[in-house]
């Protein structure tokens, strides 16, 4: 299937024959990306490209999160899912199982008794997996920092990618943390720890 337009031959994709009234040429015929693809297709008959950009784009637009709500910060995390903020419009949807989740949001005071459960849930998540630490208690122990039963930050148990400060942080702060995580994934393709 080919279409001849002047001196150039268009191989793929098949043109719909829509002509731009301003220029008199086929729409898309002056697109540099379109010409590069057509040149490679007409030369070899197939296209060789990297799927990294596509995978990174899909990964940032479909982050599935799992709640690990331990204390009062979990209320703000729930508020983030309500219609006023609607975090699903950013491609950030909740999942109940760690095996279907990409992101774990640790919200609240992590105790020594709960730490092995946190690690077990983290280990059940598929790669690549990300962790958002939400609130002062999850970040560094918070108000209960000097208690004998409190872990002084969930980063001692699992690697943390984004820290959201506050006691409790607002839903806007969590949304900002989600957007920062997406930006980091877009910039690097993954997050180096």
UniProtKB/Swiss-Prot annotation:
Its cofactor is [4Fe-4S] cluster. It is found in: Cell inner membrane. Keywords: 4Fe-4S, Cell inner membrane, Cell membrane, Iron, Iron-sulfur, Membrane, Metal-binding, NAD, Quinone, Translocase, Transport, Ubiquinone. It is a peripheral membrane protein. Its main location: membrane. Its EC number is 7.1.1.-. The keyword Metal-binding applies. [4Fe-4S] cluster binds at residues 72-73, 137, 167. Binds 1 [4Fe-4S] cluster. One of its GO terms (cellular component) is plasma membrane. GO terms for biological process: aerobic respiration; electron transport coupled proton transport. It catalyses: a quinone + NADH + 5 H(+)(in) = a quinol + NAD(+) + 4 H(+)(out). PROSITE patterns: COMPLEX1_20K (PS01150). The keyword Transport applies. One of its GO terms (molecular function) is iron ion binding. Belongs to the complex I 20 kDa subunit family. NDH-1 is composed of 14 different subunits. Subunits NuoB, C, D, E, F, and G constitute the peripheral sector of the complex. NDH-1 shuttles electrons from NADH, via FMN and iron-sulfur (Fe-S) centers, to quinones in the respiratory chain. The immediate electron acceptor for the enzyme in this species is believed to be ubiquinone. Couples the redox reaction to proton translocation (for every two electrons transferred, four hydrogen ions are translocated across the cytoplasmic membrane), and thus conserves the redox energy in a proton gradient. This is NADH-quinone oxidoreductase subunit B. The gene is nuoB.
């Amino acid at each position: 299937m080919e279409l001849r337009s002047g001196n150039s031959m268009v191989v793929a994709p098949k043109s719909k024959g829509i002509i731009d009234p301003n220029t008199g040429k086929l729409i898309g015929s002056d697109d540099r990306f379109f010409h590069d693809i057509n040149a490679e297709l007409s030369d070899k008959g197939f296209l060789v490209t990297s799927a990294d950009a596509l995978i990174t784009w899909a990964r940032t637009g479909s982050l599935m999160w799992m709640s690990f709500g331990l204390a009062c910060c979990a209320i703000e995390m729930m508020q983030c899912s309500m219609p006023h903020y609607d975090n699903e419009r950013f491609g950030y949807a909740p999942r109940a199982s760690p095996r279907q989740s990409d992101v774990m949001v640790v919200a609240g005071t992590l105790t020594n008794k709960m730490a092995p459960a946190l690690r077990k849930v983290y280990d059940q998540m598929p790669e690549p997996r990300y962790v958002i630490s939400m609130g002062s208690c999850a970040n560094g122990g918070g108000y209960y920092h000097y208690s004998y039963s409190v872990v002084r930050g969930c980063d001692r148990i699992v690697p943390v990618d984004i820290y959201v400060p506050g006691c409790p942080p607002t839903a806007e702060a969590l949304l900002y943390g989600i957007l920062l995580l997406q930006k980091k994934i877009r910039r690097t393709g993954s997050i180096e720890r």
